[in-house]
Each structure stands twice: as C-alpha cells, then as structure tokens.
Curated annotation (Swiss-Prot):
Keywords per UniProt: Chloroplast, Membrane, Photosynthesis, Photosystem II, Plastid, Thylakoid, Transmembrane, Transmembrane helix
Coiled-coil region: none
UniProt protein name: Photosystem II reaction center protein T
GO cellular component, one term: chloroplast thylakoid membrane
Membrane topology note: Single-pass membrane protein
Transmembrane segments: 3-23
Lineage: Eukaryota, Viridiplantae, Streptophyta, Embryophyta, Tracheophyta
C-alpha cells in the first residue's frame, strides 16, 4: 500500500509544479491568428 501513497504524492507534486509553471507564464503571448 505504500507504493500507492508514494505514487499519489509524486503525481500531486508534479501536478502542482506543472500548474505553477503554467500559470506563471505571461498571458500576453503574441498569438498569430
């Protein structure tokens, strides 16, 4: 059961880091439409 807990912690940590980097990006990105 410890493996499940470690997997959950790993996924949650990666998710937090991903969202932190994603939301830290400036929204004023030159979009070419």
């Amino acid at each position: 059961m410890e493996a499940l807990v470690y997997t959950f912690l790993l996924v949650s940590t990666l998710g937090i880091i991903f969202f932190a980097i994603f939301f830290r990006e400036p929204p004023k990105v030159p979009t070419k439409k």
